Amino acid sequence: MLANLPATRLANISPKTPVRKQPYTTDISGKLILLGTGTSVGVPALGCGCPVCTSENPKNHRTRSSAIFGLPEGNLLVDTSPDLRTQLLREKIGIVHSVIYTHEHSDHVMGFDDLRLFQFYLGTPVPVYCRKIVEKRLRKAFDYAFDDQPTTHQGATPSIALHSIDREPIQILGETVTLIPLRHGPRFDVLGFRIGNVAYCTDVSEIPNDSWDLLQDLDTLVLDGLRYEPHATHLSLAQATEISQRLAPRQTYFTHCACRMDYDEVNAVLPDGIELGYDGLQIDLV
């Protein structure tokens, strides 16, 4: 029994399970997976007893919005939601090769610290792509990951390599990522992303004139669709549906959905080719 061994003996015992040098992970190549499809407070929302928040339908349980692309050279994570660890464990995804951010709001960045483990698997800092305003928020919220003070041990803080992005397409993990400028209410700019004929556009209230052409000829559009009623910084269900019908992709999925948006009830009234997304939904990139 270990409980009866003296400390000198315990110090020389090694665990039977070796340290894993390669991650235990599912191959998601050629897929876009919606890790989270919920609004900033998630669904169920704390203290809410509405039929959706108390629903037993797992498609009504929505973690904070995030997604991951399985690209030719690895997994590209979109945003680090506060639920990131839970999301990756649920999907059995054990490694992130790069991260790209839509914007700087807390429900999209506060899982940043969960990137710590990936430096061990990659053997290098995790490449992170973001606009300057997002970098500023990361440096402020996670100052310990950026200061000059030596860490006590490897893995004590996230190890990342920042890359600034703005509007020009970029190459990440063997694919071209098209950046789509979007509006998130009167004060905030966000980025959507297009890879091939699939586009991911969350936290949207308006598509600027110059961005419509970037969203033509899509197979799949993932688009903000917060709730039935209008909102200052998000698309309502009617607004999102109108945009989808104008762009006419083969399939649209709404994300960043609030409670009271029952999965089955909303889908029953949406036009053909438009549905609510749900946590864990897999979309083909080909």
Predicted feature locations:
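Binuclear metal-dependent hydrolase catalytic cores
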Residues: 4-6, 13-201, 267-285
